[in-house]
Amino acid sequence: MKKLAIIGATSVMMMTGTAQANFTSSGTNGKVDLTITEECRVTVESKSESFLRSGLVANRHITNLGIQSTGCGTGQRVALKLGAGSYDDTNGAHMTHENGTDKLLVSMGSATGDGTQDGGVYYINRDGNWNGQMVFIVRNDQQHLPTGKYTLNLEGGFWTK
């Protein structure tokens, strides 16, 4: 019993006798981002382009975006999903103006024509990896739109049937 009391007193003394350090911030902050993906990983290139308003005519080529995939197998078709502010049932695919209201209507497809659009998702018509170019063009004449920045958001992934 005496031994138990001594051990208990020693434990308490060690806990209460521990000094605490103070942290003072004096530098820059850093962070680590980790993205976990499916085995079928699709990477979408980003680009910035500049046009004159008079160039917003039907079928005007806007840009090509490179798509690369790895690890895609049977039953997985490389796909792009039009993200927030880039697709709705009324306008279809579009680029949204920085004012949040105006929309530049666009069409998209693979440079080789081997894909299908299903709502806000465009997928390649075969299983497995696909590395290629997506083409974006102006739909209809749209010179009436205000100048400024328009954005199209895309998410790489895969489509399963």
UniProtKB/Swiss-Prot annotation:
Primary location: other
This protein's name: Afimbrial adhesin AFA-I
Gene3D superfamilies (UniProt xref): Dr adhesin
Subcellular location: Fimbrium
Role according to the record: Hemagglutinins of uropathogenic E.coli mediate adherence to the upper urinary tract. These adhesins bind to the Dr blood group antigen and also agglutinate human erythrocytes in the presence of D-mannose (mannose-resistant hemagglutination (MRHA)).
Keyword Signal in record: yes
SUPFAM superfamilies: Bacterial adhesins
Keyword Protein biosynthesis part of the UniProt annotation: no
